Amino acid sequence: MADAEDIQPLVCDNGTGMVKAGFAGDDARAVFPSIVGRPRHTGVMVGMGQKDAYVGDEAQSKRGILTLKYPIEHGIVSNWDDMEKIWHHTFYNELRVAPEEHPVLLTEAPLNPKANREKMTQIMFETFNVPAMYVAIQAVLSLYASGRTTGIVLESGDGVSHTVPIYEGYALPHAILRLDLAGRDLTESLMKILTERGYMFTTSAEREIVRDIKEKLAYVALDYEQELETAKSSSSIEKNYELPDGQVITIGAERFRCPEVLFQPSMIGMEAAGIHETTYNSIMKCDVDIRKDLYGNIVLSGGTTMFPGIADRMSKEITALAPSSMKIKVVAPPERRYSVWIGGSILASLSTFQQMWISKAEYDERGPSIVHRKCF
């Protein structure tokens, strides 16, 4: 890795819902759905050169004839063959690079099982022949992207949410909490709400429409009960949405009922604590001396934290739980949808980081377990 200066590292953030990839120092140039689609019916169209699998946007656009699968569930890779297809697509089709020429920085969910980190490492070196790689925890990268090294990150993506307290750049594993409630559950719950109103959304293709409704129209109420009253008495919060077939639907209270689930998981029958309480519980698992630093640096990250109103509501709820004199600051960076990727891009560009990479030589000598020694 002597001539590492002129070789741009690749940064690939594999989320449950979206892959974000690109070159360190740039913006994420490839953002596409983490899906692999396979034809439901084999070879209906002779001579069409039908592929046995489609990845990302192509799978998305042909979703009508495919069965769609997400290889990452709740933030953790569950199907390695499909995951390999996604990485192959990322390098060769999206970024159009030869992976054997670039160091690769991958991201992982907090508390990712050890065997999974080893498998990622193995695939990178043995299948893609990368010269060097590194695995970084997603929340830590988000915190770097916000210009901090200490704070607590509430990460909520499509498949999973975590609260991750970080002190001087190191995640504190004993205080990390996982909540299996995230964007996909909110989409599902909105599908149910709309179905109760007589709009049928059932297939995986229709789920994507509902996801779009959620992303465009949903918001978090500062006071849920009061917002419900407002919704009953006036039509001020109603908005129209045009479906692909031209039908127009009106959504009102659903706009804030949908993300309210983050604060009240019992609304969809989950026994878990809401994101505000989980954040508080995470802080309380930390040493009393660092809590003040955590309360003052609560950083939101991931697509499911993009709802308007979420930061104010978080601030209100945590203020109610915390000691009364505590200064509470919730930070919602505008680019938080991509902050994991941005943090990876920053990290991989640092001159001080260059000795952190796991090289091919080290891998050949030690095997996949090297990842636990070098990435923590």
From Swiss-Prot:
S-S bonds: none
Classification via Gene3D superfamilies: 3.30.420.40, Actin, Chain A, domain 4
GO molecular function ontology, one term from the record: ATP binding
The EC number(s) this enzyme carries: 3.6.4.-
Keyword annotations: ATP-binding, Cytoplasm, Cytoskeleton, Hydrolase, Nucleotide-binding
Enzyme class: hydrolase
Protein localization: Cytoplasm, Cytoskeleton
Gene Ontology CC: one annotated term: cytoskeleton
Broad class of the protein's primary localization: cytoplasm
A Pfam family hit: Actin
Catalytic activity: ATP + H2O = ADP + phosphate + H(+)
Function field: Actins are highly conserved proteins that are involved in various types of cell motility and are ubiquitously expressed in all eukaryotic cells.
PANTHER family noted in UniProt: ACTIN
Family named by the database record: Belongs to the actin family.
Record's protein name: Actin-2
